[in-house]
């Protein structure tokens, strides 16, 4: 069952800036709109954001986004008085609806051993943060777990009971360290109601708990996949789904990932302004925030919000949000 709804009316404007230390290691400089050099967290604060999202990988080859690296970035968020979301991938690298690879050191575990490993990794990471006086507001148990995680053991379509058991193990581990943290289960495709009912009906049926539903909302990918025909349709469906899911599962929601085309900054600003406005004013107070994913990203990834190492008009949508 979902957790009780809260009365906190703060709206969170955030960004996933998990790549910060890796960019610094590559000597990648960032600048504000005036051309002044800025550290990434400081730049997000300057833009007007009040929250940061950081992913955790179990044993990444290069060390970026392991628990110690996340601690370094979390200290910066604390310095700038920004609320913190921790996003556990439960993988050594990217986890998303198309891949949920078991960490190399966990790959031969049986189900009970996997639950223990997941819980222990969750506890150890969060305890490290807590020991360093870091407050954690939200914790994601899995990243875009539309098809479950820790495949094949926790693939939701084949093993819903095991996916639910693993999710519950994560939930309990979070609450052991941060009893007041909000635990999020996060899916992609916020415009597609069916995938949300499939996962959350399954979790509920098998006794797993969560406090908040996290959504990815990317009009660019929705249009590309044929889920919607326009960004307006994506936003409209997301608003409808937030109302429906809030009522059905008695929990609040948050858009924990979004993005727009970096090469079309004015269009991107329009999309983000409309999405943020809809989240703030059309969801009955049940959407608690919007987080842009990797705004500083440039190059192969098409949905960053920077050009020439500085923010484009897309980020003005966050600065101007009221």
Whereabouts are the PLM-identified features?
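N-terminal substrate-binding region of glycoside hydrolase catalytic domains
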Residues: 7-78, 82-83, 91-118, 124, ...
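Mature, Sec-exported extracytoplasmic domains of Gram-positive
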Residues: 10-12, 18-22, 55, 114, ...
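Active-site beta-loop-alpha junctions enriched in small/polar residues
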Residues: 18-20, 57-59, 89-93, 141-146, ...
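Aromatic-rich peripheral "rim/lid" segments of glycoside hydrolase catalytic domains that contact
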Residues: 25-29, 94, 230, 244-250, ...
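Bacterial Sec-dependent N-terminal signal peptides
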Residues: 1-7
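Hydrophobic faces of well-ordered beta-strands that scaffold small-molecule active sites
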Residues: 13-17, 52-54, 84-88, 137-141, ...
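Acidic (Asp/Glu)-rich catalytic clusters
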Residues: 8-9, 39-48, 72-83, 127-134, ...
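Active-site cleft segment of glycoside hydrolase catalytic domains centered on the general acid/base Glu
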Residues: 66-71, 96-202, 206-210, 222-240, ...
């Amino acid at each position: 069952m979902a957790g009780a709804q809260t009365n906190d009316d703060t709206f969170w404007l955030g960004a996933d800036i998990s790549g910060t230390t890796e960019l610094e290691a590559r000597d990648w400089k960032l600048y504000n709109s005036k051309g002044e050099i800025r550290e990434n967290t400081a730049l997000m604060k300057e833009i007007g954001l009040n929250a940061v999202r950081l992913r955790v990988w179990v044993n990444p080859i290069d060390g970026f986004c392991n628990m110690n690296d996340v601690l370094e970035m979390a200290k910066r968020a604390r310095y700038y008085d920004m609320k913190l979301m921790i996003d556990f991938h439960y993988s050594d690298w990217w986890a998303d609806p198309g891949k949920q690879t078991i960490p190399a050191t966990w790959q031969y575990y049986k189900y009970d051993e996997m639950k223990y490993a997941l819980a222990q990794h969750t506890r150890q990471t969060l305890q490290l943060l807590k020991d360093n006086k870091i407050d954690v507001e939200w914790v994601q148990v899995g990243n875009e777990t539309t098809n479950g995680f820790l495949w094949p053991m926790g693939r939701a379509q084949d093993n819903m009971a095991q996916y639910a058991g693993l999710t519950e193990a994560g939930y309990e581990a979070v609450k052991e360290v941060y009893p007041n943290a909000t635990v999020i289960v996060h899916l992609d495709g916020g415009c597609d109601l069916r995938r949300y009912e499939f996962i959350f009906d399954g979790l509920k049926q098998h006794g797993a708990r969560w406090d908040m539903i996290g959504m990815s909302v990317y009009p660019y990918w929705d249009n590309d996949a044929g889920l919607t025909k326009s960004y307006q349709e994506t936003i409209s469906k997301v608003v409808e789904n937030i109302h429906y899911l809030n009522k059905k599962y008695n929990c609040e929601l948050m858009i924990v990932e979004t993005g727009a085309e970096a090469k079309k900054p004015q269009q991107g600003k329009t999309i983000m302004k409309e999405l943020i406005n809809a989240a703030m004013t059309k969801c009955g107070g049940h959407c608690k925030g919007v987080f842009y994913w990797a705004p500083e990203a440039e190059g192969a990834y098409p949905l960053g919000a920077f050009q020439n190492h500085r923010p484009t008009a897309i980020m003005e949508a966050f600065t101007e949000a009221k």
